[in-house]
UniProtKB/Swiss-Prot annotation:
Signal peptide: none annotated. Residues 497-572 are annotated as: Disordered. The keyword S-adenosyl-L-methionine applies. PROSITE patterns: SAM_MT_TRM5_TYW2. It comes from the Eukaryota. This is tRNA (guanine(37)-N(1))-methyltransferase. It comes from Plasmodium vivax (strain Salvador I).
């Protein structure tokens, strides 16, 4: 047997994990197998090994039967006598008479079995099947026979291997109860008694068989525990990101990490890439150095979470599948028609979730690649109420403060959208309280909408969009609409359908003149990107973003989908009005545990604007004019100091502490480092915060 230190390749692993198992097996006619397999009392005693058949053909495993002399006959006679002592019936000779005769002959003259023309080589044996029994049966049988002064054959396995457990309940208790009942009572467990009665009643034979198992009969966890039996924390759990398996190896596995990765890759067909994190997340973009251990070097992946498709490049941006429970918790916490501010959004997963609850979402990330994939995922999931930004966190929050989304008095949000956010949102959707009515019409396109898309398809700059949006049954209409005699009709319909989705009305060539576009619109105004009243905060691709003032050059993207020229937004901007009267509380998500608490100081300005000690000209308290602003701020801390750590930082950054705050443990990063989230209503931060100047 090889030691773990000798394991260098997958071939070494396969050699090490080979093992044999000697056990009893039932021999019966193949026509009775299905009936026996349906017997739940008998089924719990059958051998259950990963990717190993429960029923074996006699001829294929004939060579695995063990020479035991008179032992098999003694076991069978013991079973018959035991059942008779319980009041069992006679053996049925109709069902398996041939099997009984042939195997009786075999037990008395086993030494001649290998000779040609013996009963084992006769044709009727093709009707025989073997059902191996597990170690639990061997142990229970051994306890029964010991009371008669007998024991089972030496070498028969008594210890169940991993994977040899069934959770099928027997009469009077589960599987573990069955194993204990034999020791507690003089008689056999009820489930075993029922199997023994079946053996006698059906004329089933008992034989001893030695089976060989190996790498193919073990799952990933079993293989790793077999290779590293002395390790209490063998890596058998890992984070899955689409087709990527992400492991964090400690030093003691340094020499074996590649072979462990090969095992994981080989045992899991959905995995194509296995990586190791070489350092911690210390840079602004929350990325780490990837070490490829096995598989293909492909970090562009797709995953699903709660019916949401998420596309990302794991090498260039942050993602943590372990936070799914936390995302679900936030989803259940946030009410419908809330305003969501995700300061460190990554690929936008919080907003993608919460937009399903008709929330107006503002998502920001300083990482340009994360920002680009955020927009990709919005389009992929057909979300229509998410505005995306690529800004420093403080600049992002300051932008929202100037927009006035935290004020109860702001009924209409007037803002300018760049081309990307113009594509992301639907004004009809975000300004409608009855969203279900809007969503109900998404199933099929109306004929007029198809013709509008057809006209756009004829133009060179919109071919890609039409390939995605036009259905197969509309393609013939597209060809017809491109003809000269249909152009006028398309233009008229284009004007009429302009309100159905704003992206259709701005994809045509801006240099073309259209007499039907002269009608002014109150909600939409086009401005040059360099206009003094240009969009607040929306950063065009290529402009550097910072958290601390330093310039962060964008990283190369390896020709990803986000770099496609046809998807790049133009410099055109749009004036829009959003009805904030239909939205309620504000939820600010700050999922950057390393430094998120340090960013709370950006809300000092908001506390000063709505100081509890000030009144407006009508005599109303300024603080009452502020929406409920619920902060969800994540942080790392030692488990014994988490509350003091949060309270100290909140007091330092905000100049006061809230009346109430809730701290929830999210996950264990290491024994001395846990992730928490502190949650409070910014509106309830008083005392020193009232005196901020």
């Amino acid at each position: 047997m090889r030691n773990a230190v000798d394991i260098k390749t997958l071939a070494d692993v396969k050699e090490k994990v080979k093992h044999e198992k000697r056990t009893h097996c039932l021999v019966l006619n193949k026509y009775r197998v299905n009936e026996l397999l349906k017997n739940k009392d008998a089924k719990i005693w059958f051998l259950n090994i990963f990717r190993f058949p429960s029923v074996l053909k006699f001829r294929e495993y004939q060579g695995c039967l063990v020479e035991t002399g008179p032992y098999d006959g003694e076991v069978l006679r013991f079973i018959h006598s035991y059942v008779e002592s319980l009041g069992g019936g006679e053996v049925s000779g109709q069902v398996s008479g041939q099997v009984n005769d042939q195997l009786s002959c075999q037990m008395t003259s086993h030494a001649n079995d290998s000779q040609a023309g013996t009963p084992l080589a006769d044709a009727p044996l093709a009707d025989c099947r073997l059902i191996p029994l597990n170690a639990r049966f061997n142990r229970a049988l051994h306890e029964l026979m010991q009371r008669e002064g007998k024991g089972v054959l030496e070498g028969v396995d008594m210890r169940p291997e991993e994977g040899d457990e069934r959770d099928v309940a027997a009469e009077g208790g589960g599987v573990e109860d069955v194993a204990q009942q034999g020791a507690a009572h003089q008689d056999a467990p009820p489930a075993l008694e029922k199997l023994l009665r079946v053996i006698k009643a059906e004329g089933i034979q008992i034989r001893t068989i030695q089976l060989q198992f190996g790498y193919d009969n073990m799952n990933t966890s079993q293989v790793l525990r077999k290779v590293f039996p002395s390790e209490s924390e063998v890596i058998h759990k890992y984070e899955m990101i689409g087709h990527i398996a992400h492991l964090n190896f400690c030093e003691r596995f340094e020499n074996h990490k590649k072979v462990i990765a090969e095992i994981i890759l080989d045992k899991n067909k959905s995995i194509r890439t296995v990586i190791n994190k070489k350092d911690s997340l210390k840079n602004v973009h929350r990325t780490f150095t990837i070490e490829l251990l096995a598989g293909e070097e492909n970090y562009l992946t797709m995953l699903r979470e709660n019916d949401i498709k998420v596309k990302l490049n794991y090498e260039l941006m942050y993602w943590n599948s372990k936070l799914k429970k936390e995302r679900d918790r936030i989803y259940s916490l946030v009410e419908n028609n809330s305003i969501v501010v995700d300061v460190f959004a990554g690929v936008g997963i919080f907003s993608l979730h919460l937009s399903k609850k008709n929330c107006l979402c503002f998502s920001n990330d300083i990482n340009l690649h994360a920002y680009n994939f955020m927009n990709v995922n919005i389009k992929l999931n057909k979300r229509r109420s998410i505005l995306t930004y690529n800004l420093d966190a403080r600049a992002f929050v300051c932008m929202l403060l100037r927009l006035g989304i935290f004020s109860r008095d702001t009924s209409t949000l007037a803002m300018q959208l760049g081309e990307q956010n113009w594509r992301n949102v639907s004004l009809d959707f975000v300004n409608s309280a009855g969203r279900d009515v809007v969503d109900a019409g998404k199933g099929k396109k109306r004929a007029a909408d198809c013709k509008v898309d057809c006209k756009e398809d004829c133009k060179e700059d919109c071919k890609e969009d039409c390939k995605e949006d036009c259905k197969e049954d509309c393609k013939e209409d597209c060809k017809e609409d491109c003809k000269e005699d249909c152009k006028e009709d398309c233009e008229v319909k284009d004007c009429k359908a302009g309100d159905s989705h704003q992206s259709n009305s701005h994809q045509s060539n801006p240099h073309e003149s259209n007499p039907h576009e002269s009608a002014p619109r109150d909600k939409k105004k086009k401005l040059a990107h360099g206009d003094a009243n240009g969009p607040l905060g929306e950063r065009p691709p290529g402009v550097a973003a910072t958290h601390g003032g330093e310039e962060v050059p964008p990283e190369p993207t390896n020709n990803e989908a986000e770099q496609k020229a046809e998807d790049a937004p133009t410099n055109e901007t749009h004036q829009v009005d959003i009805n904030l009267g239909i939205y309620g509380d504000v939820h600010v998500l700050m999922n950057l545990p390393q430094t998120a608490l340090d960013f709370l100081d950006v809300f000092r300005e908001l506390l000063h604007m709505y100081s509890a000690g000030q009144k407006d000209p009508q005599g109303r308290c300024r603080r009452d004019q502020m929406r409920n602003v619920f902060i969800h701020c994540y942080f790392f801390s030692k488990p014994e100091l988490f509350y003091e750590h949060a309270e100290r930082n909140i007091r330092m950054q905000l100049g006061g502490i809230p009346r109430e705050m809730k701290i929830t443990e999210i996950r264990k990063v290491s024994p001395s480092k846990l992730m928490y989230v502190v949650e409070f209503n910014l509106k309830d931060v008083f005392s020193q915060g009232d005196q901020l100047g």
